[in-house]
Amino acid sequence: MSPIALLSVSDKTGLIPLAKALVNDLGFKIISSGGTAKLIESENLPVTRVADYTGFPEILGGRVKTLNPKIHGGILARRDKQSHLDDLDKQNINPIDLVVVNLYPFVKTISKENVSWEEAIENIDIGGPTMIRAAAKNHQDVLVVTDPSQYSNLIDAYKSKKITTELRKKYSQQAFEHTATYDLTISNWIANQSSSKKVSWLQSLPLKQELRYGENPHQKASWYGEPEKGWSGANQLQGKELSTNNLLDLEAALSTLREFGYKNNISNPSYQKAAVVIKHTNPCGVAIGDSPSSALKRALDGDRVSAFGGIIAINCPVDEAAAKEIENIFIECVVAPYFDETAKEILSKKKNLRLLELKAESVQKADKNHIRSILGGLLIQDLDEPSIDQKKWKSVTELIPTDEEMNDLSFAWKIVKHIRSNAIAVASNQQSLGIGAGQMNRVGSAKLALEAAGTKSKGAVLASDGFFPFDDTVKMASDYGISSIIQPGGSIRDEDSIKACNELGIKMILTGKRHFLH
């Protein structure tokens, strides 16, 4: 008796070469339905339609096609159980040896703009997952394939007679993973369309890459991510394999950079061209410039010592001039929406430098949850998204910041939220001058930032991610010539800091919003 393959796929990639190999090279008979059967028939390949095999037509507009005992009995019957084989004989059911199924394109459907509830629901596959799960359960007798990328290996295994138990288990595991991911996607989408709160966190991400190691060589690490979303959508143009620390730094760089926009092109002359330099997930240089090269040079000038071995992110295409700024410094990675051919040629001389093109579309598609692990669980929060509402800011001192100072205060406020708390940023003329990060007291971070800025701090502005518990930071800022301060406010001693500002001739803005980063 010829082996039987059941083929029912939404993604028709590689279907015809597979069907030809099964029929012509391996002697399979094919059972199929709908568009899959129609495509196979168009190639003059023999195929039995499901409705003809079961004797039961498709009903409910195609909702019921393969949900039939002649299909599922053929898949689920164990060949080593005589009672199962007897049942097949009694019911005139043929055993099915291979199930090739992929599912209705639910993800593609819900990704469309303004997709209707009805259209999404109609793209929830029922028969497909049922066949996949049945075949995966009975993997000792039935091979199950769910992705076109598996077809070549499948045919090779048949031809070389290497259909091993291990291969069957591998395909079974991948099949259950496929249906689990599909169900999770549907569950999460329905939850997002309703007002009910999710009672459990469900997410399935495919393995993107096994990393060389974690933050340190003795730690194992893997990278999981949704295809085409966020960093999984980045195209590495050159350089060594990305490391765990590279990815953490790249994420910090992009988070900071998005405060200023992120676009594939800069046709709008008013678009802010920004560059960020990151070291150990903290910004050490941030600046806006008239061109990509100007922004990058100013960001590097913010702290060239710390920039050594860092990560660079630019929110617009990298051209020849920008590439030349990178050419003679040691940098681990550069990420931008685009690198022109001249820039790529210049930077190709730095063989170990990792260049990544990350399109704006991949950034926009990424999940807006911030997830961190704790012992035995996860903490999930909304991203601290780029947003500034100056209408809610309050000028609380006798002196009011000038327009130029307000621009710098806004710039510094965008930066400070991406510095590890306690965080202080000193800036002037849309350029960071000093960063104080991760100190256990706020005045300690202020000291680091002000000392880094040095004499450049005269007339500059200072931003703090949290309120001032005492007036000591104001007094230190005055010693360095700071003109204006921006901070959330909310301390029971706010008046002490405001009083100190008035006495020392410093302007102060309270935003009413805190930006801790742990």
Swiss-Prot record:
Q: Which NCBIfam families match?
A: PRK00881.1, purH
Which keywords appear in this protein's UniProt record, sorted alphabetically? Answer: Hydrolase, Multifunctional enzyme, Purine biosynthesis, Transferase
> Which CDD domains does UniProt cross-reference here?
IMPCH
| Gene name, Swiss-Prot/TrEMBL | purH
- Record remark: domains: The IMP cyclohydrolase activity resides in the N-terminal region.
Please report the stretch or stretches of sequence annotated as the MGS-like domain. Answer: 1-146
User: What Pfam families does the annotation carry?
Assistant: AICARFT_IMPCHas, MGS
Q: Which family does it belong to?
A: Belongs to the PurH family.
What cellular component GO annotations does this protein have? Answer: cytosol
Q: What is this protein called?
A: Bifunctional purine biosynthesis protein PurH
Q: Which HAMAP family match?
A: PurH
- Give the organism the record lists: Prochlorococcus marinus (strain NATL2A)
Gene Ontology terms, MF aspect? IMP cyclohydrolase activity; phosphoribosylaminoimidazolecarboxamide formyltransferase activity
Keyword set includes Kinase:
no
Stored Gene3D superfamilies: 3.40.140.20, Methylglyoxal synthase-like domain (3.40.50.1380)
Transit peptide: is it a keyword of this entry? Answer: no
Q: Which reaction does it catalyse?
A: (6R)-10-formyltetrahydrofolate + 5-amino-1-(5-phospho-beta-D-ribosyl)imidazole-4-carboxamide = 5-formamido-1-(5-phospho-D-ribosyl)imidazole-4-carboxamide + (6S)-5,6,7,8-tetrahydrofolate; IMP + H2O = 5-formamido-1-(5-phospho-D-ribosyl)imidazole-4-carboxamide
